[in-house]
UniProtKB/Swiss-Prot annotation:
Domain of life: Eukaryota
Native organism taxonomy: Eukaryota, Fungi, Dikarya, Ascomycota, Saccharomycotina
Protein name: Dol-P-Man:Man(7)GlcNAc(2)-PP-Dol alpha-1,6-mannosyltransferase
Any one GO BP annotation for this protein: dolichol-linked oligosaccharide biosynthetic process
Any Pfam family matching the protein: Glyco_transf_22
Organism, as annotated: Saccharomyces cerevisiae (strain ATCC 204508 / S288c)
Family: Belongs to the glycosyltransferase 22 family.
Protein localization: Endoplasmic reticulum membrane
Enzyme nomenclature, EC number: 2.4.1.260
Amino acid sequence: MRWSVLDTVLLTVISFHLIQAPFTKVEESFNIQAIHDILTYSVFDISQYDHLKFPGVVPRTFVGAVIIAMLSRPYLYLSSLIQTSRPTSIDVQLVVRGIVGLTNGLSFIYLKNCLQDMFDEITEKKKEENEDKDIYIYDSAGTWFLLFLIGSFHLMFYSTRTLPNFVMTLPLTNVALGWVLLGRYNAAIFLSALVAIVFRLEVSALSAGIALFSVIFKKISLFDAIKFGIFGLGLGSAISITVDSYFWQEWCLPEVDGFLFNVVAGYASKWGVEPVTAYFTHYLRMMFMPPTVLLLNYFGYKLAPAKLKIVSLASLFHIIVLSFQPHKEWRFIIYAVPSIMLLGATGAAHLWENMKVKKITNVLCLAILPLSIMTSFFISMAFLYISRMNYPGGEALTSFNDMIVEKNITNATVHISIPPCMTGVTLFGELNYGVYGINYDKTENTTLLQEMWPSFDFLITHEPTASQLPFENKTTNHWELVNTTKMFTGFDPTYIKNFVFQERVNVLSLLKQIIFDKTPTVFLKELTANSIVKSDVFFTYKRIKQDEKTD
């Protein structure tokens, strides 16, 4: 695999997003807890696995978790040699998510190399065939692809997240798309079909699109398209049934079970439905701000060779098919986003390398490209700044652990209610039981919770006052509030309005204040401090003992 400085920048940006937002949310919980259990208990003793206590509505595949756990194992081995004492395993969580980010990042780089190899091969052939004629050059196509990626908040932020769409699914679909660009159509159909049945069934729409348009463009026969699709589905089914039936202790094929429950039975619609056009009118616009890449797609498609057209049409087919599912989420079509960027990169490379700079309009047109990337990057950083404040459960757990360590508290039980568990609490964040003896209870059943309530020494909950806690005599206070955790809840426009609409000021004087009087750094700090609203959402309580009450 060829490597460039920009490849390193891509991985660095992905890592930066990870460090800025180290916690996870409920959508990521299955994979992160499964990876924790595999690393902690091994695959041979599943009796203590979290999914047996909290199985969820339908089974989910363990295949991705097993792969990521295997790739993370060397870190555990090295850390055991160093023998450093760590209060929690949050560092392991960061490594695990870093491995997920690495698989996604390397797949983007591989796809970039496939794009560039395709254009380099085409250019060489044209040079041999037309020695005396000018030909279009696309030497920067791969570079533009990476630049568009780096400015994409959704791909950079979520590349390290243990959402099922990003744990092996997106990396392998990127490889499949790369194989199409290299002319390996049968292999691409085989791999994408395997990914669909093992990891995410919606990828079957992308796989079908690759097969359909490979046949339409006469790259393979219909027989081969069907044959390799069946081979992929067959091998993937065998892998999933073998692995997942073991972990779930019953025969299952999770992606089929999920399809029957969510799509056939219609339970996914309970999470909300949107119009057929929503992916095109809302989600794609949300993922491409400003919409330069989308605008370049029309131009890029006209210039694209057949291989790239197959990739782009297959991705469009994927989005269209998913549009008929009433419940929509941006991550369901994330596998099509790299293809959109491939076309955008093709259009950008053509303009950048082949447009003659003779008119002012041409200069302005070319200037839009780097300006657009800079704008996307700044928008992405703004989204990151806000998004990192949306994991208060993880912050609350960290503050609780710090208190336990600082005050040398041992052998206690803390109950964590559902909302904190959904916004950052994971098994990796728990203190080492052998050292501190802290039990982290997450019981959801009301009857069991009432029975266990007297045994809790601490609570991390969403209830703002002790009088609102369940199973308590409202006239007697048994709990002391020891900590609160804030979360981003909105914007206050007062500061920016007062700054912009000062008396007797114009644009130049405002810029002077920002650049010279305050400096941009100070202005941004003041802007964020005065405009971003954070409110208390989680509350940590300590049980008041009888002797403390008397005192």
